């Protein structure tokens, strides 16, 4: 889900070992610039409730109410995952991450929606060839029965399936 969760584990030792207080790390969140925010905001249904930040070269969305807490935790703890991975920005256009397709706050009007039949959806989830006629030119949100499956990009008569290799299905 999209709840706000934090977990900390402490190793129990046998003897009198010292308690190590983690040092504050440098900030890993770089606030998104004005241009980046404009591009990222068009992908979410309620951009006024979101804050956008870059971690390395990937942009993430955080709810405004949780951003400062997540930032503080990330500065002192090792964070495995946080926020909604929006994707990378190339030439002022977002290359969306799969997590964005799964985000319930995604604005479905940001890109054309390609509704697939069950057979076509299974082919998409297997990362097999897709019929270009089912997709609009450019980036598409791929759905089946109204549920988002991921993104695909049509370039002329070819479709680039952006479904992650690690999630594809092999037998069905």
Question: Could you say what each language-model-derived stretch is?
Answer:
Residues 12-172:
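Polybasic, low-complexity RNA-engagement segments
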Residues 2-7:
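Short hydrophobic/aromatic beta-strand or adjacent loop that forms the aromatic wall/cage
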